[in-house]
UniProtKB/Swiss-Prot annotation:
MF-aspect GO terms: metal ion binding; tRNA-guanosine(34) queuine transglycosylase activity
Subunit structure as annotated in this protein's UniProt entry: Homodimer. Within each dimer, one monomer is responsible for RNA recognition and catalysis, while the other monomer binds to the replacement base PreQ1.
UniProt EC number: 2.4.2.29
Naturally occurring in which organism (per UniProt): Neisseria meningitidis serogroup C (strain 053442)
GO cellular component assignments: cytosol
Protein name as annotated: Queuine tRNA-ribosyltransferase
Name of the encoding gene: tgt
Alphabetic keyword roster: Glycosyltransferase, Metal-binding, Queuosine biosynthesis, Transferase, tRNA processing, Zinc
Active site, renumbered: 90, 265
GO biological process, alphabetically ordered: queuosine biosynthetic process; tRNA wobble guanine modification; tRNA-guanine transglycosylation
UniProt keyword Metal-binding present: yes
């Protein structure tokens, strides 16, 4: 089940509601990444506290470990991980294609060696749909070939055509399995605007209830990614949700929303938190730096997260230097809370028709820097 309601537009920025089998999502939305069925350093209560509406799970990793037999015993991923809100799963394609020296790609699918035990495994559109049906994610993704950013035009065209054929197979398998959730198609085409349009036109025939933009933030320069967003975001179908996969920084989220994107996921806020890199309204802060050793202030005095309301930079500096798990948890709570606040503020600004003003103030604040 998927129902998308577009409430308001302000330029290309969109304010909507996405209804799924496990609840409603207000968009634009950021989805914390729970690769192995957990968002690193967070428990489900932490996620509820920061007002996360939906999380992402990784099909490839969950298939390898703990496996479908285990997760199937719990009726899917929600029951297994104790999360009652929506979940999106990727198709597993990105991880398989990352194993460039351990995999073989054909029209049928991809053969690869398990990085866990060396077993020979095979992933196809049909198998990806079967895995995601067992996971019972609210949003599943088609299996696509992940085109590298540096692909030549001919490589990108061949790749997107393969992805279109796999989109058709994914949709058929999804329907044959009587999966009650939603399946998204993925727009590919590397850094070529005309190929992105060709991919989008090709996907129209399958009438997916939502569309994702894939193949960005894969090593290309930031101006190139933004050029593709300017080209693709505004031409995505208005009545469907738009998902930008694997992106990104706070500035990337704002740029994406400004060009018609509704949904985002990225490991950056969680990974950076574990490395002591904290996002704030006034720029980024590296908590490991010695200047924080005696600092009694919170990370961000305007922030209402648990970490900022209860702990000093000095304590967080100590925890990080000591390698304490609590440090990673508090840093992660802060970064994910900050991302959720950005999204909530953008939703409000779009509703009020003041997105451009909000965007200008956001960039001014971020450029100011922390002291």
């Amino acid at each position: 089940m998927l129902k998308f309601t577009l409430h308001k537009k302000d330029g290309y920025a969109r304010r909507g509601t996405l209804e799924l089998n496990h609840g409603k999502i207000e968009t634009p939305v950021f989805m914390p990444v729970g690769t192995y069925g957990s968002v690193k350093a967070m428990n489900p209560q932490n996620l509820h506290d920061i007002k996360a509406q939906i999380i992402l799970g990784n099909t490839y990793h969950l298939w390898l470990r703990p496996g479908l037999e285990v997760i199937g015993q719990f009726g899917g991923l929600h029951g297994f991980i104790g999360w009652d809100k929506p979940i999106l799963t990727d198709s597993g394609g990105f991880q398989v294609f990352s194993l460039s020296d351990m995999r073989k790609l054909t029209e049928e699918g991809c053969t690869f060696k398990s990085p866990i035990n060396g077993d020979k495994l095979f992933l196809s559109p049909e198998i990806s749909m079967k895995i995601q049906t067992v996971l019972n994610s609210d949003i599943a993704m088609q299996l696509d070939e992940c085109t590298p950013g540096e692909a030549t035009r001919e490589q990108a065209r061949k790749s997107l055509q393969m992805s279109l054929r796999w989109a058709e197979r994914s949709k058929k398998a999804f329907e044959d399995l009587k999966n009650p959730n939603a399946l998204f198609g993925i727009v590919q085409g590397a850094m070529y605007e005309d190929l992105r349009e060709e991919s989008l036109r090709g996907l129209e025939q399958f009438d997916f209830p939502g569309l994702a933009v894939g193949g960005l933030s894969v090593g290309e320069p930031k101006p190139e990614m933004y050029r593709m967003l300017r080209a693709v975001g505004p031409i995505l179908p208005e009545h469907k949700p738009h998902y930008l996969m694997g992106v990104g920084t706070p500035e990337d989220l704002v740029y994406g929303v400004a060009h018609g994107i509704d949904m985002f996921d990225c490991v950056m806020p969680t990974r950076n938190a574990r490395n002591g890199w904290l996002f704030t309204r006034f720029g980024d802060l590296k908590i490991k730096n010695a200047k924080h050793k005696l600092d009694k202030r919170p990370i961000d005095e305007s922030c209402t997260c648990y970490a900022c309301q209860n702990f000093s930079r000095a304590y967080l500096h100590h925890l990080h230097r000591a390698g304490e798990i609590l440090g990673a948890q508090l840093n992660t709570i802060h970064n994910l809370h900050f991302y959720q606040v950005i999204m909530a503020e953008m939703r409000d600004a779009i509703e009020q028709g003041k997105f451009a003003d909000w965007q200008a103030q956001f960039h001014e604040n971020r450029a100011r820097g922390t002291d």
